[in-house]
Structures are given as C-alpha cells and as structure tokens.
Amino acid sequence: MNILTDPNKLKTSGCADVNASKCAEGDGEGSVQVQLDPNLNIGTAKVFSIYGKGGIGKSTTSSNLSVAFSKLGKRVLQIGCDPKHDSTFTLTKKLMPTVIDVLESVNFHSEEVRPEDFVFEGYNGVMCVEAGGPPAGTGCGGYVVGQTVKLLKEHHLLEDTDVVIFDVLGDVVCGGFASPLQHSERAMIVAANDFDSIFAANRIAAAIQAKSKNYAVRLAGVIANRSRETDQIDKFGERTGIKRVAHLPDLDVIRKSRLKKMTLFEMDHTPEIEAVQNEYLRLATELWEAKEPPVQGKPLKDRDIFDLLGFD
C-alpha cells in the first residue's frame, strides 16, 4: 500500500527532507530545501519552468506556449503549481481538481487515484494537471510538485510526453516552490517593462543560478509581457547578460482571451493576433531546437538594480 504523507505535516524550516551537506554547499546556509528524489526524473521530455512576479501573466504565457509546442507536433503536459489552480483553464475551459484535492479524497492512498482523476486534455491535445498546494501558511509546495510528478510516473503518463511546462506561482523562490527547477532544463521569467517585475525577475534569476549549482537547470531568459516597449528589460539584460527571449505586447485582445476562457490560438483571426501567435511559435521553435545551454547571466544586488532602472 502506498500511503503519501499529508503535506500539512511536513517540516518547512531548515533543511527538511534534504541531504544537509548538499543544502549547505548548494543554495546557502539556512536555505529551505526540498530534495529531488532521483527516482522522480521526468525522463526524455524537455522541461521548462515559468516564473515571474504575481499577476504578470505567467499562466497566459504558459498556456499559449504549450499550445505553440503542440502546433509544432509535440506532445505537451502543462503542470500548474499554484493553490489557485487556474493555470490551465484557458486550455480546459474549467477549473480542474488539484492533485492535492484528489489525494485528500482518498486519504492520501495514491494507489486509489486514477489518471482521469487529475489529468485532463485541453485544447489541441495539451494535457493538463493542477498540482494545487496546501492551505495558506501550512505545508510545503515542493512536496506537492514532487507528489504530482510521482503520480504521473506511476501511471506512465510521462513516457509519451515531449514537453513539460511548469507554471509556478508568483515570485516565491523558497525551497518548496523552487522545486520545479530541480526537474527543469530551462527556466524563463515573465516580466513587464517596469521596476517591480524586473526587480522580482532579478531575484528569481539569483534563485535559478543557485539551483544550477546542483541541477541541470539554466535560465533561458526573460519573456517581456504586457509591454509596448522593452527598454528597461533590455537595459537589465545588457547589465546582467540575461537576454530577452520574446516580446508579447500589451494588447487588449490578450485580456479578452482570458475572459473568453480561450488561448490566443482560438481567438478570431486578426493581424495582431497572428503576430502574437507567431511570436509564441518562434519561441517554442527556438526552445525546442536549442542545442547549447544559454550563457548564465549575473543577477545584480538589490541596490544595484534599484539604481539601474529608470529614465536618465
């Protein structure tokens, strides 16, 4: 019998469930860690994690990027890693039950869980999972990600997958919600052309760099979202070496697509919609064809990023 641990009972301070020496030498003394079980390797799929400031458009970006990969003929799985479980609703047209909801319903006896209980097919064949999370202020988000991957492997649902996209909540980069980085080969940060999201992006980049000491993940770059201009993002990139990999303009049709519970690939055809679709397809193609790891940038100290941004 496979009984999973209630996530509310997990320790969330210090180096819980981790090799302590690795913790100390990796992300720094006192960091909170969730150690990757070597048996939970996702396999041959290309794995991407999407981070960014809360409300910046990560779920919109993730869902449309998932569709873009599917339009290239790839088998795609999107995993939402937010207790709000709203990552995939433009793909599935509904709010899905989360992995944690399903596990709680069977008292964490995972052998009673069926794939159809937590995996749903969305637009253009994109498979969707909402990991969910423990109640606010309790438990560990990293546990949730780990158990989601474990269930997917137990049901052999990763064997026929080409691309996995983790859509990770807000700008939290604690040991728990940084755990998708342990599975990923590339991470991207969604940011607008403003101080707050670039400041958050800089701190996320530092977390990704810390994880890259012990894991294969590398920062692919910044996706400029909801931005007419990119001058501040580009200034940040010139200083840090973290490149901009895509530019998605501030278009009202993108907002409307969320209200219609649709991806941009389902919206009525217009020149501006086609331009954004093509940008997603270009990004998906570049990510799929990338042979060499990107050059690691050098995030700035908080004071330096504060002094850098703004108009002369």
From Swiss-Prot:
It comes from Rhodopseudomonas palustris (strain ATCC BAA-98 / CGA009). It catalyses: chlorophyllide a + oxidized 2[4Fe-4S]-[ferredoxin] + 2 ADP + 2 phosphate = protochlorophyllide a + reduced 2[4Fe-4S]-[ferredoxin] + 2 ATP + 2 H2O. One of its GO terms (molecular function) is oxidoreductase activity, acting on iron-sulfur proteins as donors. Pfam families: Fer4_NifH. [4Fe-4S] cluster binds at C140, C174. ATP binds at G55, I56, G57, K58, S59, T60, K84, N225, R226, P249, D250, L251. Keywords: 4Fe-4S, ATP-binding, Bacteriochlorophyll biosynthesis, Chlorophyll biosynthesis, Iron, Iron-sulfur, Magnesium, Metal-binding, Nucleotide-binding, Oxidoreductase, Photosynthesis. The gene is bchL. This is Light-independent protochlorophyllide reductase iron-sulfur ATP-binding protein.
